[in-house]
Amino acid sequence: MLDAYLAEHPESRFPSTRTLRLNAKTLSAGKRYRYALAVAGYEGLTGEPAGPGVARAATWLEWYHLYTLFLDDIMDEDVRRRTFPSAWSTNSRLYRGKDASRPGVVFRTRRTRYGASQAILDALRVRSLAERAIEGAEGLDPAVRERLLGELTEVDLVLSDGQGLDIDFETARAITESEYEVMSERKTGRLYVGAAATAATLAAASESDRSALETFARHFALAFQDRDDLLGSGVVTSQIGGSASGDIAQGKRTRLYAIAIERSPPKARAAFVRAYGRGPRSTPRDVALVRRILREHALDVVNARIESNLRAALSALDAIRFRDDRTRDLLSRLARAQGSRLR
């Protein structure tokens, strides 16, 4: 779909599409868990292989996910998206104006304004491709197409609310685990639930199977995000490159953070607060201190939460009447991987 879009919008006529081309690596580097859940779920519920129409419709989840990543990196001012430069930071390098370093009003400089502005436009293009994936899927009943578009809209509303909570957390010195889970379920979890709903809608599944698959997705998402946050803080072995300390420097409010604030002794908590979230002023010593406190007072608890959510996810999976047990095996393996994946 991206190739078709870019072919229809050559750089000679649409110069700003060069940034979309420039970020092609980011567009193709994802794990595609959401797409896998939707397609495998459909095949398991129907006992039939996913045809081209189903496969295309399910790609809306990955297009939408990319849309959120482009915007998330702007809001968090992240210069890297795991092993790649973030879209806005990549785009900023294209700015050749003599005023590149001149301070901006909203953005730090004219260069960063250019990069972020182009990334916002690219995000909107990618968001439109999510809708086009559903609209152009062949062989779908009109009612099914309408329900999928409705699911996308609902994801928009709930996920943006979760992102808003995440931004509000930046000003909170302490958050509770329950507050964190509400945010995570709305932000990360809602798109995974959308993947389960997509599978169920395409397969015309029963309400009980739909509910069980959505429950699987919800618990899977919580475990997935917790593992992501362990990797993003570098408290476990990871293969995500330089961004393994990014969450610490940026002061991300994760479950790790919530538990460390709650369970660390007063002296360790005070040192943690001083060293956490210092942005460009973060030093290797700050990062090392934060990691030590996270390992001593939060890591075991987060791993226990991951295991608990994986048990709940697998229990929900057992309740689904799949017609093809290869789906159960695949989703079980994806779930268990959240306890040990390195990237």
Please tell me what each predicted stretch does.
Residues M1-R343:
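All-alpha prenyltransferase/terpene-synthase fold signal
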